[in-house]
Amino acid sequence: ESKRLGLRSCLCYEVSDRDGEEKCLQAIQENADFITECQKNQDPMLAAMFGGHALFTISDKTFDRMVAANNGRTGYHIHVSEGMNDVYDSLQNYGRRPVQRLQDHGILGPKTILGHCIHVNTAEMDIIKETGTMVVNNPESNMGNAIGICPVLQLHKRGILLGMGTDAYTHDMLESLKVFLIIQRHNAAMPNVGWCEAMTMLFENNAKMASKYFDRKLGVLEAGAAADVIVMDYKPFTPLSEENIDGHMLFGMMGKNCRTTIINGRVLYKDREFVGIDEDKINAWTMAESKKLWSTLNDRAY
């Protein structure tokens, strides 16, 4: 679907022990097969990672199986120290903190993304830095789950490649940008921090992370880079210049201001209308599939 719609996608399937060994093995195989398929097809718009849920739902045996199935072909995507239960489980059952445990299994590396990392200590931060592993902060999700705040300022000072995500809590990255800034300032009790980190994470580091998986330079307007452009319908009420554009993006613009979207040179959304996409058909399919899923999970009809 992502290919048909013209989206650039790096995907994986979440491995977990929660549903028993059979489902776990199927999830591992799904990742392995998808990685093989991506390597075979060499589609410049589609890439694969190896997905894992979180350390408290993945045993050492399962980690070993994941690493064997991956065979060094790609990086991993996993939630780490999102809540203290992840830390407690790791220490109680394995005698290691989460990041140490990932290092023991060879999960870390320059193409691996650790989501959240709220409760990592300084020793774990050093390991993340030494291995070149990436971290993605999801401020709204963390606040919604009331699990804490990622130590972004400390991670940033260590030179860790730190990106901004949503954990599917929202689809508006500019909304996340605003929330990130105010929660980091609130947490630090300092009204002058987080500005540079916010802009760097969203507009520079996210592109750097994606570039590790796609053989194109992303996130810049220059010859040879991917032609990814959005046009914003934004009317400023104060002077707008290259000196204060960051402030306008933080405090003025919203996702709904997007008027046109171009991905890899293809116009997908023009003047607030999708191009070559039957929105009603997709919405109907999504509703039907969600009803099937909810019915299966909740044992009732919708």
What is each PLM-predicted segment?
Residues E14-D17, E82, P139-M143, D167-Y169:
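Short, acidic/turn-prone active-site loops that include or flank metal/cofactor-
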Residues F203-Y302:
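Active-site microenvironment of metallo-dependent hydrolases
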Residues V120-G132, N138-G144:
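Long hydrophobic segments that form regular secondary structure
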Residues M84-R96, E124-K129, A146-L155, T170-H186, ...:
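Histidine/acidic-residue-rich catalytic or RNA/ligand-binding cores of hydrolases
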Residues D104-I107, K111, P151-P236, L250-M254:
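His/Asp/Glu-enriched, well-ordered alpha-helical/loop segment
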